[in-house]
From Swiss-Prot:
The keyword Magnesium does not apply. It comes from Staphylococcus carnosus (strain TM300). SUPFAM superfamilies: Ribulose-phoshate binding barrel (SSF51366). CDD domains: PRAI. This is N-(5'-phosphoribosyl)anthranilate isomerase. InterPro entries: Aldolase_TIM (IPR013785), PRAI_dom (IPR001240), RibuloseP-bd_barrel (IPR011060), TrpF_fam (IPR044643). Pfam families: PRAI. Coiled coil: none annotated. It catalyses: N-(5-phospho-beta-D-ribosyl)anthranilate = 1-(2-carboxyphenylamino)-1-deoxy-D-ribulose 5-phosphate. Keywords: Amino-acid biosynthesis, Aromatic amino acid biosynthesis, Isomerase, Tryptophan biosynthesis. Its EC number is 5.3.1.24. GO terms for biological process: L-tryptophan biosynthetic process.
Length: 209
């Protein structure tokens, strides 16, 4: 299973996270987010992540210039579009930066199937998150049954995922490729090493130091 930990803000948290056999680590560049990091900060933090782990910048309705800066000034190699971006934005990014992984986050609402079809040619991976006017970050789960209709594209489940919720999700036998976790590896708004370790050991089936 693909495991992405997201919303990192400190060097110590990153140094611990990259030891946990995760597949991707996310940095949020969105001023309205409590986990927002500037491009200068992302430049420093992303350089702490080894090449074996995707370095993901999470953006919401970015300008072309923001994308250009993130991909020229930092060690980012994946862009997660988490807003209302159109296909043209994703296509532009994919064409200009063919080696960059394109991720599209979508809300788990009644438009989900339609929007997956809309973006599937441009997106390498989808993230399905709890609907919110603030574009995610709620820490709340959604009705996972809506995922039954997703059959032909890879997607990660987001929305307050913890070890216990992952176990509940697994019982449904859906086709998720993995999980995108931010609040589920935090305690009182800060990254919790024990939660990171617990989830990665459960998902990857390996004991980490």
């Amino acid at each position: 299973m693909f495991l992405k930990y997201c919303g990192f803000q400190t060097q110590d948290d990153i140094k611990y996270a990259v030891e946990q056999h995760i597949d991707a680590i996310g940095f949020i560049h969105y001023p309205k987010s409590k986990r927002h990091q500037s491009i200068d900060e992302i430049e420093i933090l992303s350089n702490l992540v080894p090449d074996t782990i995707y370095r993901v910048a999470v953006v919401v309705n970015p300008t072309d210039d923001i994308i250009n800066q993130l991909l020229s000034r930092t060690n980012i190699n994946a862009i997660q579009f988490h807003g209302d971006e159109d296909r043209e934005m994703l296509r532009w990014c994919k064409n200009k930066y063919p080696d960059v992984k394109i991720i599209k986050a979508l809300p788990a609402d009644d438009t989900l199937s339609k929007r997956i079809q809309q973006y599937k040619e441009e997106a390498d991976l989808f993230i399905i998150d709890t609907p919110s006017i603030h574009y995610g970050g709620t820490g709340q789960s959604f009705d996972w049954q809506v995922l039954e209709e997703i059959q032909d594209v890879p997607y990660l489940v987001a929305g307050g995922m913890t070890k216990e919720k992952i176990q509940q999700f697994e019982a449904l036998h859906l086709n998720a490729a993995g999980y995108d976790i931010a609040s589920g590896i935090e305690t009182n708004g800060s990254k919790d090493p024990m939660k990171m370790k617990e989830i990665s050991e459960y998902i990857k089936g390996e004991k980490q130091i």
